[in-house]
Amino acid sequence: MIDRYKHQQLRIGSVSPQQISAWAKKILPNGEMVGEVTKPYTFHYKTNKPEKDGLFCERIFGPIKSGICACGNYRVIGDKKEDPKFCEQCGVEFVDSRVRRYQMGYIKLACPVTHVWYLKRLPSYIANLLDKPLKELEGLVYCDFLFARPVAKKPTFLRLRGSFEYEIQSWKYSIPLFFTTQGFDTFRNREISTGAGAIREQLADLDLRLITDSSLVEWKELGEEGATGNEWEDRKIGRRKDFLVRRMELAKHFIRTNVEPERMVLCLLPVLPPELRPIIQIDGGKPMSSDINELYRRVIYRNNTLTDLLTTSRSTPGELVMCQEKLVQEAVDTLLDNGIRGQPMRDSHNKVYKSFSDVIEGKEGRFRETLLGKRVDYSGRSVIVVGPSLSLHRCGLPREIAIELFQTFVIRGLIRQHAASNIGVAKSKIREKEPIVWEILQEVMQGHPVLLNRAPTLHRLGIQAFQPILVEGRAIFLHPLVCKGFNADFDGDQMAVHVPLSLEAQAEARLLMFSHMNLLSPAIGDPISVPTQDMLMGLYVLTTGNHRGICANRYNPSNHRNYQNEKIDDNNYKYTKEPYFCSSYDALGAYRQKRIYLDSPLWLRWRLDQRVIASREVPIEVQYESLGTYHEIYGHYLIVRNVKKEILCIDIRTTVGHISFYREIEEAIQGFCRACSYGT
């Protein structure tokens, strides 16, 4: 449907019988109205043509072959001549056969039938609105209980029942036997009701606004009572309050959407278009039918039997009529949701029939597989792995995926550069993977972003744009900082890659969807690009070390993996001498030469602004020299001062991991400052 803002949308909800009739009914040019499916047959076993008024009727759903009626006559579709647009003999219109994909039919039910989704699914909408136990409503729907109609100021049999309370159970059996079928129908229509018709009557009598007001009043009264001190009573009150809230919300929803509650009881059953429940022939000519066809046949058989009982038979007991109504209800339940009431219906091979719910729900259902997750051109899919060397706005695309996604662009590039004379030659060069193919592919990818999507896409950061680069292997490389937006990790997650084709899509990807432009959460504004997963583990390994400072060597000398591993003997006390470096470059060079480890403690000359040292820490030890200079030794650094207490130099105790981390942060801040200065 299209709303007032011209947005295409799909709305799922209850439908009125008038709307179902409007979908299915159509008036032929001769004035005949068709649309009702009355026969449970599909194809004739001799002619192999659809049966008239059956589940594949061409009069109802349209011709199987475009422009050809059931008689075999042909008319040109769209011909503006004044010839009749339908066959006068068989009543089939000369239209396109694609109409069988959307033209619906309907089954006129002989008795009302509740929609099992609204009755059995939890929470039960019907039970919530009527404020009655679900078991009681089920007994009413399946004709196990009877519902007394309020007949005022009239003598009734049910009023006499009050005088004989001990015979209440016998009335259920004695009343039907007392009357003939015609008399019982009169009595039942006047005084009692059962089946889905009783539910429909109660739903039609509801005042939704009164339900909302009364539920709110009761909820406030329960809230004012407070705790009773009895745990069981408090839980009961809490459940009642939760139920009242659900009931108010449900009633408000019906009011807001302008939907009548009695629509949850069906009088007309829609029949799906035949192309959505096909019958095909497999090898050997054996027909293979959709399970829904068999379930529709079951409904039609039972509905026709009930119609015959109500219209033709005069001596059928009322109990048999109610039993047949129950069978119709169960058949419709199986069609809508097989197995929701217990044991599912099976075929002769003990295979469970796939109902309408099975067709549309789940990962392989119509919505997730065909509508939401359908395969499209210029798209691929692969496992994601971490790419720590990538920029935030880049992703690594495998060569095998990239050459398929950008194949048309590469073909155009080969022809423009006169490396190929036609499309066939260009494709052969791509199959042979000639070097010029990769050169052109690199040029194409430099100016073309791609979209990465990880299902489920629950918010807008579930799909972001990246600048692709070629990588080896078959996995997509992803920067770990963008994992939180995708809710992804590197334990086997898969992501889909799409190529925006139009200029508008590419502009939107560059201006709005690039990963480095989506650093904040659109919901709460917090940073979304934060270290997670492998980055946290890497930062921990990078900055780990002995946090006891200089005291570690004095009281617990256990680290023997240091520079030169030089040990000094002083009164039988052994400790490891820690190396000293004048610059961070020397320390990193020693690490690359494997002379020290990543977490090896070392001393580094601090050459930055010494005025930033503003610590109130008391030195562990102060060592004086003969020239007046002295050393203040702290837990993680050492300050050398002259006689005037001026700082001459500072040595800090750190590790190679801390040095690397500090340099990365420093370079990032400097780059950010340069970018800001360019922007201003």
From Swiss-Prot:
The keyword Magnesium applies. One of its GO terms (biological process) is DNA-templated transcription. Keywords: Chloroplast, DNA-directed RNA polymerase, Magnesium, Metal-binding, Nucleotidyltransferase, Plastid, Transcription, Transferase, Zinc. Transmembrane segments: none annotated. Binds 1 Mg(2+) ion per subunit. In plastids the minimal PEP RNA polymerase catalytic core is composed of four subunits: alpha, beta, beta', and beta''. When a (nuclear-encoded) sigma factor is associated with the core the holoenzyme is formed, which can initiate transcription. This is DNA-directed RNA polymerase subunit beta'. One of its GO terms (molecular function) is DNA-directed RNA polymerase activity. HAMAP family: RNApol_bact_RpoC1. SMART domains: RPOLA_N. It catalyses: RNA(n) + a ribonucleoside 5'-triphosphate = RNA(n+1) + diphosphate. Pfam families: RNA_pol_Rpb1_1, RNA_pol_Rpb1_2. DNA-dependent RNA polymerase catalyzes the transcription of DNA into RNA using the four ribonucleoside triphosphates as substrates. It comes from the Eukaryota. Zn(2+) binds at residues 69, 71, 87, 90. It is an enzyme of class 2 (transferase). Its main location: plastid. Its cofactor is Mg(2+); Zn(2+). It is found in: Plastid, Chloroplast. GO terms for cellular component: chloroplast; DNA-directed RNA polymerase complex; mitochondrion. Belongs to the RNA polymerase beta' chain family. RpoC1 subfamily.
